[in-house]
């Protein structure tokens, strides 16, 4: 997953104050507009009447989709409805900022294709808009001999996904890159990187408004009416358009249900918690250090992530959150918790992975246990090297059978498209996801 780290305050500072000049935002023009606009969206050029679009959700996927629509169809009527006072406050703002190159994903899947396309597009976007980013590379470490065959299969998967330059390293070669890492072998993945997704979000908003689009804040979608066009009720007013595109992230299943879709999948919120290495311990990690995935478990496991700001994060675990926006252990939303605990899929998931669920919970309350998991990658790590970091919540779709939906998942409705599963690597792939959404709309 793209990791988690709470950066909401920094985002507000970035958008409203510090980086106006860096992002070339005109001081006399508001970054976020309060009113919609009208234009024509030529999704199918052969049609006489081309549709306007409302995008529900102003996270990085919703904003990237709006930007791609406006780039492909200049002058289009595109409005983003965001429920918060600042865009991108949830998954986007609680993101450690990894640029995923597509190594882990099944060849031919949407995740594989869109991650490979998306990292290239995101790097180009960052270059164009002067967004801080770095292609720093990653090591995927086999911690024992039993993991080497899985590492070899991962190497083959990376090649199948079109990744160039990945290498198998023996122990000595591995230690030349990461002297403190444990294990017996590793994959060197040069394409992987890090980025400031908060700055990406601010640049996307500027780009959208420059092209004539609108981002409406404090506009939670509360009701949907389908007639000759869609009308969406929000506290900021009612908005109408021919098409709706649901990019509501943690609430995408509920938004789709409001719009008349059957809720076949459900978002089950898993909180990922991080520690950070103390400044005096950061020398232990030079790059991104990841484990070889265990196919017996649905989550990747803890790893080390360099931050574009200079720190090192370690984690995450994966525990059930008691609120869809529950970034702290004490956060509780009765509706969200009831929604999760009454879902048969969650209980079937827990029965499939009882030991994993217990261990993930142990890591949430025990720094000593958490550090033991990290020691598999960097044996020198001690609990004293760690300080509490950020956390975030995955918008992970789960089936009634208790399986995590492994690929990006879109559902079509009447003049509607719903993004119902977009966890990692969705931030990396957001621009490519936007293009994919447009392609699906044009085929509908």
Predicted segments — roles?
Residues 106-117, 141-150, 188-207, 361-366, ...:
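Short beta-strand to alpha-helix junction loop
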Residues 64, 224-333:
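Flavin-dependent oxidoreductases
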Residues 187-242, 431, 435-440:
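Helical element adjacent to the flavin cofactor pocket in flavoenzyme catalytic cores
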Residues 262-264, 281, 307-309, 314-391:
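Flavin-binding catalytic cores
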Residues 48-61:
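Beta1/beta-strand and adjacent pyrophosphate-binding region of the FAD-binding site
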Residues 97-173, 183, 301-302, 313, ...:
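Dinucleotide-binding Rossmann-like beta1-alpha1 core, especially the glycine-rich loop
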Residues 70-92:
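Glycine-rich FAD pyrophosphate-binding loop
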Residues 349-444:
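C-terminal catalytic lobe of FAD-dependent flavoproteins
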């Amino acid at each position: 997953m793209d990791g988690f780290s709470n950066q909401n305050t920094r985002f507000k500072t970035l958008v409203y104050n510090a980086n106006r000049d860096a992002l070339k935002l005109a001081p006399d023009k508001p970054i976020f507009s309060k009113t919609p606009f009208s234009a024509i969206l030529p999704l199918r050029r052969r049609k006489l009447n081309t549709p306007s679009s409302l995008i529900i959700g102003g996270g990085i996927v919703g904003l990237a989709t709006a930007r791609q629509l406006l780039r492909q169809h200049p002058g289009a009527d595109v409005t983003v409805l965001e429920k918060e006072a600042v865009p991108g406050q949830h998954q986007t703002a609680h993101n450690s900022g990894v640029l995923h190159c597509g190594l882990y994903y099944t060849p031919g899947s949407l995740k594989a294709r869109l991650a490979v396309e998306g990292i290239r597009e995101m790097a180009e976007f960052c270059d164009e808009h002067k967004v801080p980013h770095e292609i720093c590379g990653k090591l995927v470490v086999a911690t024992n001999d039993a993991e080497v065959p899985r590492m070899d299969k991962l190497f083959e998967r990376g090649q199948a996904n079109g990744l160039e330059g990945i290498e198998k390293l023996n122990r000595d070669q591995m230690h030349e890159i990461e002297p403190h890492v444990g294990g017996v072998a590793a994959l060197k993945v040069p394409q992987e990187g890090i980025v400031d997704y908060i700055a990406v979000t601010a640049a996307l908003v500027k780009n959208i408004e420059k092209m004539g689009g609108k981002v409406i804040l404090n506009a939670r979608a509360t009701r949907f009416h389908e007639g000759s066009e869609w009308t969406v009720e929000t506290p900021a007013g009612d908005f109408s358009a021919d098409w709706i595109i649901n990019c509501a992230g943690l609430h995408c299943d509920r938004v789709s249900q409001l719009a008349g879709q059957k809720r076949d999948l459900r978002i089950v919120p898993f909180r990922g918690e991080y520690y950070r290495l103390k400044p005096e311990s950061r020398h232990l990690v030079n790059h991104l250090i990841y484990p070889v995935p265990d196919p017996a478990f649905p989550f990747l496991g803890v790893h080390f992530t360099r931050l574009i700001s200079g720190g090192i994060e370690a984690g995450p675990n994966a525990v059930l959150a008691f609120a869809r926006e529950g970034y702290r252990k004490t956060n509780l939303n009765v509706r969200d918790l009831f929604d999760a605990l009454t879902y048969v899929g969650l209980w079937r998931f827990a029965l499939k992975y009882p030991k994993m669920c217990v261990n993930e919970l142990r890591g949430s309350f025990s720094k000593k246990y958490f550090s033991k998991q990290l020691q598999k990658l960097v044996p020198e790590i001690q609990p004293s090297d760690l300080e509490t970091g950020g956390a975030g919540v995955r918008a992970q779709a789960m089936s009634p059978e208790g399986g995590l939906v492994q690929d990006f998942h879109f559902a079509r409705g009447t003049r509607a498209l719903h993004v119902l599963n977009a966890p990692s690597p969705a931030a990396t792939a957001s621009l490519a996801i936007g293009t994919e959404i447009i392609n699906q709309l044009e085929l509908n």
